[in-house]
């Protein structure tokens, strides 16, 4: 298994609407963008195997814990090829349990949602305001490698700013992670 370090790219732009989806969660419920009523919605493309995700998943759990569900809702989406090592629905359940995820974890086995967002790496976070307009696409914090300790909690600061009605300094600051494992065409 190889890890390809990938920077997120900018497909969605500031003020673009959040692309809709209907995806199954590890709780066997289906979720759509309309199900989330929070002031901020953080869609994060994650997976089960990537060292970058493993290093930052605790930060996402902590971030969700710091805000009420009416302020912030995080949604994890796994768009990796389910056949890839350590991926797939059953491994998502295991990953969620091992990391005490406190937010929905959804499977995008068609990979169409990742494509509609322009997600290319894991983690690849997209922060939307109350009307589901994109306000920020980018890193969770300033740690560039999994073993680094973050000094600046970029996403937390951005969530606070959005909740306070402030305009963000940056709307794009690329995330770094493993490439999404795309299905190969037959």
Residue ranges and their predicted role:
Residues 1-163, 167-172, 179-186:
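Chalcogenol-based redox active-site neighborhoods
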């Amino acid at each position: 298994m190889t890890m390809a370090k990938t920077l997120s790219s900018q497909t969605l732009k500031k003020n673009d609407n959040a692309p809709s989806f209907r995806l199954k969660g590890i709780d066997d419920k289906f979720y759509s963008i309309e199900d989330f009523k929070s002031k901020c919605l953080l869609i994060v493309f994650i997976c089960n195997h990537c060292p970058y995700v493993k290093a930052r998943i605790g930060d996402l759990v902590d971030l969700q814990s710091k805000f009420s569900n009416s302020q912030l809702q995080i949604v994890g989406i796994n768009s990796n090829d389910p056949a890839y090592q350590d991926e797939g629905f059953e491994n998502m359940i295991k990953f969620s349990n091992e990391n005490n995820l406190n937010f929905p974890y959804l499977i995008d086995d068609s990979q169409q949602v990742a494509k509609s967002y322009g997600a290319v790496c894991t983690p690849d976070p997209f922060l939307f305001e109350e009307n589901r307009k994109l306000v920020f696409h980018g890193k969770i914090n300033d740690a560039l490698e999994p073993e680094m300790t973050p000094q600046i909690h970029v996403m937390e600061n951005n969530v606070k700013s959005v909740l306070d009605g402030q305009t963000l300094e940056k709307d794009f600051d690329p995330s770094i992670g493993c490439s999404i494992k795309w299905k190969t065409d037959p």
